[in-house]
């Protein structure tokens, strides 16, 4: 099995691709850049976009994981939805299955969330709604990591010191959530 991960520092943090490979037994390749949005992955005029296009045109994948910039579904929803649609078309043309990696709200009470003047519950809800809408509209699988973070946030330290990125435990939960979606999909094919 081969998995391509498209994202940014949320996707590369704490060796997430290697953790996903360990949990699935798959070869995992990552096309990511810190701060990248899915629109950049779709734009072949960017370095990252040309890497993504080459990977989708020249290699075979079983799954492609899509991760948008942390608050992109809220601050740039039009770009988010159109980028998911465009990438899903390319992924399916490759013969692969797209998976949306639904991200989390910044840490409750954290400096970054406070500085933006955002409400934790509202951000978590809006992100979840956007990812689920994109999944429905594009008939994709969804790894709802944001929901797992929301459920576990009061009981575990899921965030790095910046209150934005995942801690090692947070990245492990990301890997487990994505692996679970893949394993369930593989079992359903039997």
Label every model-predicted segment:
Residues 108-112, 116-190:
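Catalytic His-Asp segment of secreted/periplasmic serine-dependent ester chemistry enzymes
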């Amino acid at each position: 099995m081969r998995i391509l991960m498209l994202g940014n520092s949320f996707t590369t943090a704490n060796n997430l691709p290697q953790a996903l490979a360990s949990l699935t037994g798959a070869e995992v390749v990552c096309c990511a850049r810190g701060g990248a949005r899915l629109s950049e992955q779709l734009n072949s005029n960017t370095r990252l976009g040309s890497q993504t296009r080459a990977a989708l045109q020249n290699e075979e994948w079983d799954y492609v994981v899509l991760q948008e910039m942390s608050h992109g579904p809220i601050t740039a929803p039009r770009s988010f939805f159109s980028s998911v649609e465009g990438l899903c078309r390319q992924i399916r043309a490759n013969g692969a299955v797209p998976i949306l990696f639904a991200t989390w709200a910044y840490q409750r009470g954290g400096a970054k969330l406070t500085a933006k003047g955002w409400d934790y519950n509202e951000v978590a809800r809006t992100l979840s709604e956007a990812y689920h809408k994109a999944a429905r509209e594009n008939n994709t699988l969804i790894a709802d990591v944001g929901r797992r973070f929301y459920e576990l946030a009061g009981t575990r330290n899921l965030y790095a010191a910046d209150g934005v990125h995942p801690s090692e435990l947070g990245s492990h939960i990301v890997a487990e959530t994505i692996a679970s979606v893949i394993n369930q999909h593989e079992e359903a094919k039997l």
